[in-house]
């Protein structure tokens, strides 16, 4: 690390030293609120809950649920090439830990990322002493990057994503982020726009595309799927996936336009909204069953509110098509590739800024379709050509898996250098 890079980190490191005494208090408050896992919250203080295995170890970090699930294909590709390699995956959220426990992440170890303060950083790196570090997407902690660089640990940034607004925010601390990005041996970006934004910090990125198309299929319970299939009968099933209120309004409106409504499954992004969704659907005169109450759909059920966690793999397998949530309001979209991986046709509203490149690729390839309102959603669901979308999406998924295979080879070459 150059002297100018060390200088760039200075103010940030000083601030983390000052704030460090507050970290345990903040974590205990979050624990009381149910935002931390009772048996594992001290991992965020750098206290490992499992032993480090012998042998070389790659440390990979992704902040949340979607980002962590996107790493599963890369972990599988690395393990296929180097079975003896140990992989540590860190995340920051309780939801991501629960999703990885439900869906698996190969033979990798999961831990929570330590808070970015001196003692936690040191304890984490002392215990795990990784041979190589991989940062994914946007959650990059300057103090940890600095600490790893000081120990001579090679670091790369993959699946990098940065729009102009994010660049402008970071430019307010330009010296810090020039130092951070200068510590990476390689920066692998999702798209050309990201490379342009990163270039403003004096570093170069290569375009390899997004990891999300290669995401492994979400898990489900085959026995439960069979039971639900028997309960539903021959009716078609369609889904409002990871939905928010405006998505649900569009989906419920579509029921009045469909030639054969079938069964609408609403799987809200936040399951605690289940009672609210049930009340709204019943106010429209619809017959509703609620999963969190132990109810199953029957031949008369029009709406099934799937207000539970960790079952999206089940709903995507049951449904022939999904309206992806967050695409009808200022949420600006959720990940469409989970549906693609399970041959569920993708429909979405106009608000997709969080996954703009992904939806553009899917739409251009005839693998997804934009719908503006309930009538348009119903027309898409009634279109006999809707099923053609899944085959086109499968082609794009395979391209993503080829990308991941190439990236895994690049990372191992970097690690061995």
What kind of region is each of these model predictions?
Residues 200, 317-390, 394-396:
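Catalytic binding pocket for nucleotide-activated donors in carbohydrate/polymer assembly enzymes
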Residues 66-81, 219-294:
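Conserved catalytic-core segment of nucleotide-activated headgroup transferases in glycan assembly
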Residues 399-417:
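C-terminal alpha-helical cap of glycosyltransferases
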Residues 100, 104-112, 278-307:
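Nucleotide-activated donor-binding/catalytic signature segment of Leloir-type glycosyltransferases, i.e.
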Residues 24-222, 244-245, 258, 269-270:
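Active-site and donor-binding regions of nucleotide-sugar-utilizing enzymes
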Residues 124-126, 180, 231, 315, ...:
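Structural alpha-helical scaffold elements that stabilize or flank donor/cofactor-binding regions
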Residues 128-132, 301-331:
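Acidic donor-binding loop of glycosyltransferase active sites
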Residues 5-31, 178:
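Short hydrophobic helices that act as membrane-entry/anchoring signals
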């Amino acid at each position: 690390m150059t002297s100018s890079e060390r200088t760039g980190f200075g103010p940030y490191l000083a601030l983390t030293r000052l704030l460090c005494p507050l970290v345990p208090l903040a974590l205990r408050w979050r624990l009381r609120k149910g935002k931390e896992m009772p048996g594992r919250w001290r991992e965020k203080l750098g206290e490992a809950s499992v032993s480090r295995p012998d042998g070389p170890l790659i440390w990979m970090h992704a902040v949340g649920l979607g980002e962590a699930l996107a790493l599963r294909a890369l972990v599988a590709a690395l393990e296929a090439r180097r079975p003896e390699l140990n992989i540590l995956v860190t995340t920051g959220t309780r939801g991501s830990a629960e999703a990885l426990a439900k869906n698996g992440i190969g033979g990798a170890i999961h831990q929570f990322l330590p808070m970015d303060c001196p003692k936690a950083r040191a304890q984490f790196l002392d215990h795990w002493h990784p041979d190589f570090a991989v940062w994914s997407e946007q959650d990059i902690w300057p103090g940890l990057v600095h600490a790893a660089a000081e120990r001579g640990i090679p670091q790369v940034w993959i699946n990098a994503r940065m729009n102009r607004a994010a660049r402008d925010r970071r430019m307010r601390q330009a010296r810090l982020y020039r130092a951070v990005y200068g510590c990476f041996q390689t920066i692998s970006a999702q798209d050309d726009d990201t490379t342009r934004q990163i270039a403003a910090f004096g570093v170069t990125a290569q375009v390899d595309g997004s990891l999300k198309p290669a995401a492994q299929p979400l898990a489900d319970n085959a026995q439960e799927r069979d039971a639900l299939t028997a309960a539903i009968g021959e009716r078609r099933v369609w889904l409002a996936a990871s939905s928010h209120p405006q998505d649900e309004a569009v989906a419920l409106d579509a029921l009045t336009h469909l030639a054969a409504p079938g069964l609408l499954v609403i799987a809200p992004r936040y399951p605690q909204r289940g009672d609210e969704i049930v009340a709204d659907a019943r106010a429209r005169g619809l017959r509703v069953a609620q999963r969190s109450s132990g109810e199953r759909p029957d031949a008369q059920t029009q709406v099934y509110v799937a207000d539970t966690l960790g079952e999206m793999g089940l709903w995507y397998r049951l449904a022939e098509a999904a309206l992806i949530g967050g695409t009808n309001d200022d949420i600006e979209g959720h990940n469409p590739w989970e549906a693609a991986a399970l041959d569920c046709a993708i429909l979405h509203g106009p608000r997709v800024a969080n996954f703009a490149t992904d939806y553009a690729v899917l739409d251009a390839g005839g693998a997804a379709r934009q719908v503006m309102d309930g009538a348009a959603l119903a027309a898409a669901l009634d279109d006999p050509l809707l099923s053609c979308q899944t085959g086109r999406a499968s082609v794009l998924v395979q391209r993503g898996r080829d990308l991941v295979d190439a990236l895994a080879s690049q990372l191992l070459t970097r690690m061995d250098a």
